[in-house]
């Protein structure tokens, strides 16, 4: 088994990485198993170069992490805690953050997807709907009447 693999981003840029790094992605791991020994670049059609490099940076840092079991995944998802390195890694602009989340989902890198989603959850935590709209530049398309109706229907969920 070769120690290196070449990935080709959606913008046709080839990036060579350690196989162990690339195999943090279940999609790439399965592709490599299906392709066998090949010198051809592995196409990653839904991820551009800058996002792929960010994902590879994360995978490189976490390449020696053990693959988690389903139960460990559940426990990890129940908390919004993020380790310090991952917090720093996720300090990117919103567009890049969402691109990383989409790439992690597409590439089937569950731990990275969790970190991205926890980052967004922490951005939302404790904010009012107005503050959330402002944070994510979301237009409010509800009429005041619709807002009142939604508040009444969800009164049970309000903090008291």
Swiss-Prot record:
CDD domains, per the entry: BTB_POZ_SKP1 (cd18322)
Name used for this protein in its record: E3 ubiquitin ligase complex SCF subunit sconC
Keyword Thylakoid: no
UniProt KW keywords: Ubl conjugation pathway
Subunit structure: Component of the SCF (SKP1-CUL1-F-box protein) E3 ubiquitin ligase complexes.
Gene3D superfamilies to which the protein is assigned, alphabetical: Potassium Channel Kv1.1, Chain A
MF annotations from Gene Ontology: DNA replication origin binding; ubiquitin protein ligase activity
